[in-house]
């Protein structure tokens, strides 16, 4: 089965919801088209990012969202920041050839 490396930007409520959704994907899509591997989560500070990584099951945390966009192993950039911060991140992710997911509330 194909695996997809996920980088999630933002670590608030929607990040938690998306993280739970990645974990539950095989329960809703059977057979699942692939498995999400939660690689990196970004938040405003290193401390917050590392805490979010531990709480939400990501391998690592970073305070720089560009670390996710620039990582050649990341397949999907999931944007869970406030809406007014989506554009710059989405454009950078698209230019890097990433698949883009986002939370819109």
What is each model feature region?
Residues 1-56:
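N-terminal Rossmann-like dinucleotide-binding module
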Residues 44-47, 56-102:
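Beta-loop-alpha module in the N-terminal Rossmann-like domain of NAD(P)-dependent dehydrogenases
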């Amino acid at each position: 089965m194909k695996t997809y490396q996920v980088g999630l930007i933002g670590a608030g409520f929607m990040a938690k919801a998306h993280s739970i959704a990645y974990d539950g994907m095989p329960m809703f899509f059977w057979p699942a088209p692939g498995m999400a591997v939660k690689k990196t989560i970004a938040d405003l500070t290193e401390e917050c990012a590392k805490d979010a990584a531990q709480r939400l099951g990501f391998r690592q945390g970073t305070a720089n969202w560009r670390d996710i966009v620039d990582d050649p192993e990341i397949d999907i950039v999931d944007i869970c920041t406030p809406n007014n911060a989506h554009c710059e991140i989405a454009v950078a992710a698209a230019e890097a050839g990433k698949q883009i997911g986002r939370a819109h509330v």
